[in-house]
Amino acid sequence: MELIIATRKSKLAQVQTEKVMELLKGKENVDSKKLLVMTEGDRRLDVSLNKIGGKGLFVKEIELALLNKEAHGAVHSMKDVPFELPSEFELVAMPEREDIRDAFVSLNGSTLSNLRKGARIGTSSIRRAEQLKLFRDDLEIVPIRGNVQTRIKKITEENLDGIILAAAGLKRLGMEDVISDYFDPKVFLPAIGQGALGIECLKGGEFNDYFKALDSKEVRTTVEAERSFMKVLNGGCHSLIGAYSEVKDNDLYMIGTFTVNNRIVKKDILGNKEDNILLGKKLAEKILEEV
């Protein structure tokens, strides 16, 4: 038996899927292969995500492959997965979470704090751009899209002083050496689910249990809390929304940020990790009290 796993065509997506394939072989002794899918988000690199529909752009075609029984499961970056899945699907496993931090990449090793006044920083993320302005309101934000390698090339092609990328992607690609600095995730809040992988299947799929065996309870606890926070705020690519969460013993600590009436609001919450979804909801409600 050989399971078929659908994923995007990018090098990072393939590396992430290969990690899941290794886990399947190691834990379940199951062979698998990739089905590469071109998504709308990959095709439309000339337009900012917030202008063409946001997160679902990276999953719809992959879900279609599942519906058509072309694949048994799909691997996503959790930060790309909308907070509401179509009723036919479920997230059966969240097997691992890499470094959740954002990373600063510059050609000469400069950090954000020692850049020249008016430095040009590449990012198309509203979350990153708005938080950057809190650190340095003199910076010029330049929209860039593309895969990791393409964005790094744009530092020279577009005369940028640096770009911001997810540390997880760089580490998974073996490119940690290009990182000039890391952002403190409790200050510069990551995207919802950043660094985490998710495995999506059709509900009731014959082979779902193989994927479910890869689930990490701690990763699911944190990511579900963050997605609960996002669901209440209806956040996506159109607004600043970020969260940091961590499990310590039986506790879950979480920080969230969101734009309310053109003002960036940040709150935190602490509670029992078993109440993770409720805690995410309560944190969002604390922020909305600022309206």
UniProtKB/Swiss-Prot annotation:
GO terms for biological process: protoporphyrinogen IX biosynthetic process. One of its GO terms (cellular component) is cytoplasm. Keywords: Porphyrin biosynthesis, Transferase. It comes from the Bacteria. Binds 1 dipyrromethane group covalently. It catalyses: 4 porphobilinogen + H2O = hydroxymethylbilane + 4 NH4(+). InterPro entries: HemC (IPR000860), Porphobilin_deaminase_cofac_BS (IPR022419), Porphobilin_deaminase_N (IPR022417), Porphobilinogen_deaminase_C (IPR022418), Porphobilinogen_deaminase_C_sf (IPR036803). The porphobilinogen subunits are added to the dipyrromethane group. Tetrapolymerization of the monopyrrole PBG into the hydroxymethylbilane pre-uroporphyrinogen in several discrete steps. This is Porphobilinogen deaminase. It comes from Clostridium perfringens (strain 13 / Type A). The lineage of its organism: Bacteria, Bacillati, Bacillota, Clostridia, Eubacteriales.
